[in-house]
Curated annotation (Swiss-Prot):
Protein name: Acetate kinase
Keywords, alphabetical: ATP-binding, Cytoplasm, Kinase, Magnesium, Metal-binding, Nucleotide-binding, Transferase
Pathway stated in the Swiss-Prot or TrEMBL entry: Metabolic intermediate biosynthesis; acetyl-CoA biosynthesis; acetyl-CoA from acetate: step 1/2
Catalytic residues as annotated in Swiss-Prot or TrEMBL: D147
Family affiliation: Belongs to the acetokinase family.
Length: 394
């Protein structure tokens, strides 16, 4: 069966067409900078690839462009949209409503919309992608795969906040966790590599960042909480912050709640500390002596190291730490900064192995390291396709 995977972000669309269960990628690509005159469009098959700059004003135009590329007489990979059995959509927040992959109905869309308040950078964009895909790929099943689903196994002592019970029971305020599709995929890869039930910390570092403690394949704790704003220092998100700062900004500094929300989600993190949100720029400026960039990198690494310690305690031991996503897979500098002087935990990084670039799972620890240090490229699109296939087959 042919399954189209769509990851619709606030200003981008990632897509991949796969044949399941053969795990064959027919084509993949991305449209980013949607809404600008200089939208970047990529399309790649086994035998062909191209990139072009075109104005893509809306997600609807973008998804129509994806369909046109798939159907193109010369470079396309399908003859009609009816060849696609299902469209799998990544959805960041499923709240307490969705603990499993779900066929999308009008009721499901209403719930995703309702949860947009908790994931304002993500859920609205996912809804746009779903609505447009329903029009363009009308004969296909539309299926949602939720980032929060993997974290439904977190025990109550870890997911419950120390607040009045009515907020949990009536308003479902709790730790939900995010990046679950990625954490699930890379933890399974690591477990297969280690060939045993294991205690693993997965570290997803991209523009958004999160960590998860995984015991025998199940999430038992994670850094993101009620929303994707919590936890580690991120590209534009502050991560952990004393809630009193929010009250201070509103009561004493005169900001509205919406303004505070915008500051903490879109103007904070590495951007707020340095003026840059892209780690490549920050690393470059730090190497040139920029003190703000140097400090921001140290702050980022410190919070990750501190979390490794707390999760090792929660797991009662540690077999491996796993780096993944754009920064985790590609920044040898950050991996080294995080893992240096962690020998107390039995973590010793091999600086030469750490420099090696590869698209395969690789081990970058020294022979003496008690804890394995793995770099595992994530493949959220494959994980989504696999979950969609399993749902429809069963």
């Amino acid at each position: 069966m042919k399954i189209l995977i769509i990851n619709s972000g606030s200003s981008s669309i990632k897509y991949q067409l796969m044949v399941m269960p053969a795990n064959e990628v027919i084509c993949s690509g991305m449209i980013d900078r949607i809404g600008l005159e200089t939208s970047n469009i990529t399309f790649k098959t086994v035998s062909n690839s191209f990139e072009e700059i075109l104005p893509v004003p809306t997600h609807k135009v973008g998804l129509q462009k994806v369909a046109d590329m798939l159907l193109d007489a010369e470079t396309g990979v399908i003859k009609t949209t009816s060849e696609i059995t299902a469209v799998g959509h990544r959805v960041v927040h499923g709240g307490s409503y969705f603990s499993n992959t779900t066929v999308i109905t009008e009721e499901v869309k209403e719930k995703i919309k309702e949860l947009s308040e908790l994931a304002p950078l993500h859920n609205p964009a996912h809804l746009v992608g779903i609505n447009v895909a329903e029009e363009i790929f009308a004969s296909a099943k539309q299926v949602a795969v939720f980032d929060t689903a993997f974290h439904q196994t977190i025990p109550v002592e870890a997911h419950k906040y120390a607040i009045p019970n009515f907020l949990l029971t009536e308003h479902k305020v709790r730790v939900y966790g995010f990046h679950g599709t990625s954490h699930k995929y890379v933890s399974e890869k690591a477990i297969n590599y280690l060939e045993k039930g294991s205690k693993i910390i997965t570290i997803h570092l991209g523009n958004g960042c999160s960590m998860t403690a995984v015991k025998d394949g199940k999430s038992i704790d994670t850094t993101m909480g009620f929303s994707p704003a919590n936890g580690l220092v991120m590209g534009t998100r502050a991560g952990d912050i004393d809630q009193s700062v929010i009250f201070y900004m509103v009561k004493s500094l005169g900001y509205t709640p919406d303004e505070v929300n915008s500051i903490l989600l879109k103007q904070s993190g590495m951007l707020g500390l340095t003026g840059y949100s892209d780690l490549r720029d920050i690393e470059s400026k730090a190497s040139e002596g920029n003190k703000d960039c140097q400090l921001a990198l140290l702050m980022n690494a410190y919070r990750i190291r501190k979390t490794i310690g707390s999760y090792a305690a929660a797991l009662n031991g540690l077999d491996a730490i796993v780096f993944t996503a754009g920064i985790g897979e590609n920044s040898s500098f950050m991996r080294n900064l995080i893992c240096t002087d962690m020998d107390y935990f039995g973590i010793e990084i091999d600086k030469e192995k750490n420099q090696i670039r590869s698209k395969e799972l690789r081990e970058i620890n020294t022979p003496n390291s008690i804890v394995k240090i793995l770099v595992v490229p994530t493949d959220e699109e494959f994980e989504i396709a696999n979950q969609v296939y399993q749902l429809l087959e069963n």
